[in-house]
Each structure stands twice: as C-alpha cells, then as structure tokens.
C-alpha cells in the first residue's frame, strides 16, 4: 500500500494516503463494505473524500480482473462512504480500532464533503472501462481511478499516468456554449467563453486534478 500510494502522491494523483483495512462481505442482497485506507482530511483536499480499495492476488501469474469483479469492489468502497454517517455502523466498530477512529473523523467532516473518489489498487491487469456514473456514493457520482499492475510499473519507471476526468456540468445546471471555428478533414475546432465564477467553481471542486 505505502509503496504504491507514495508513487501516487509523488505524481499528484492523490493528496495523502492513510492505511487501514475494514471489510464486511456481501450477504445476499446486502451490499458488502470495504475500505483499505483514505486520502487524508477532505478539508485539506478541496472537500474531496478519497477512499482506497485493494484487490491483491497471490498468484505467480498476472491475473485479469473482469468488469464485474471491479464494479463489485468499487461498490463496496462506495458503501463504506454511505455508512460513514450511520450511527449503527459506527457503533458496530471496535472503539480501539483504526477504522473506528478514522470513520469518526470523517463523520465529523461529512457535511463539508462535496465530492468522492475511489482509488482501486491491484496487482492484477485491468482491461475493463469504468465510467464514473457506474458508481455512486451518497447520491453523487464517484470519480474512479484504477491503478493496476501496468500502471504501477509505469509509476515505478517515472512515467506519468494521464488521469481521465469527467466534469458533470449538468449537476449544477451549467453548460458550455460553443461556436464552430473551423472544420477540416482532420478535426473540428470550437470557440467558447467561460466566466470567472464558473472556472472558480470547477477549480473548487477539482483543484489540482485539472
């Protein structure tokens, strides 16, 4: 965990990484819960709550993680976020455990948090493509970042990982009006004008990830 997250922090893919493990398996229709750490205080990261989930394989061969496995684990991470403001869940945790301490710390900040991110760490190879709207926590779309064995090797070799970002403009009733500037066989170009308040709101929500 520490080796990989140190690389993520260095590459500015996350602000911080604090490790703890909590997992409750899925039972029938009752969604499981999983968290293997979080990205530090949301108040220090544009009110973004980042949760880490891990899927580690002990196989000597590199395994392929399929989309169903990936989504199932991500949803368990999202369910951990959903449970933070549940007194029933918090009271079920051992008071001396790390998960109790960190969950209560996050609960005290829950009203300040305005966005969520789940970072999936695995030594398997990921080939599925997950859109952000596939995973929700507290009725908000989660940003998803999958760091598989291939991405880890790139980080170790000093290669930057481009982080795809989807900005949901409709959530706040916004849009970007554009005018066609030119069209040719290779590409189309457009012109737009954005006001300062709009740009400030995007920066407030997405910060250094832009």
Tell me what each language-model feature is.
Residues 1-210:
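N-terminal extension/subdomain marker
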